[in-house]
Amino acid sequence: KRPVSKTSESPKNQSERRFAQIMNTADVVEIFSSIQGEGPHIGERHLFLRLCGCNLRCSFCDTPFDKTEKAAVYTNNGISYLKNPVSTGKLAEEINNFNNINHSYLSITGGEPLLHHKFLKDLIPMIHLPVYLETNGTLYHELEDIINLVSVISADIKLPSSTGLKPFFD
């Protein structure tokens, strides 16, 4: 589980952080609660945040990751929508409103969520859940930026022979 920082901020830093929460945005596909179906936490209830965009174009991929006008938020009360792009502050508020259901993790997925590493660096500290990051593992420099904020990394490495793409690493 992710440690909670108890450092105090100066009023100037608090103001700058609030401004960043409004100005830092990302396009979101959907937010939903479901049972994790892969990896070491299979069978646990996770809250899923699916972000737009991917740096790969795997021939077999069926995941919607194109930008959409609205992000779908699926709850027990039905579906609501957020206008894209969504700010870190608004998204944190939506995610933290799911606290009425006991989730083990916030699973951040895509597409490729590390395309939004700067956004995630601001968002994750505002979330009241440990983070399970699903990634294709190709954006390792971006991962360095947020690795200390993430509890679990699930890297789904794609082999060139299965994707039809060129090798990612030498």
Spans of features found by a protein language model:
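Conserved AdoMet/S-adenosylmethionine-binding subsite of the radical SAM
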Residues: 103-105, 110, 114-170
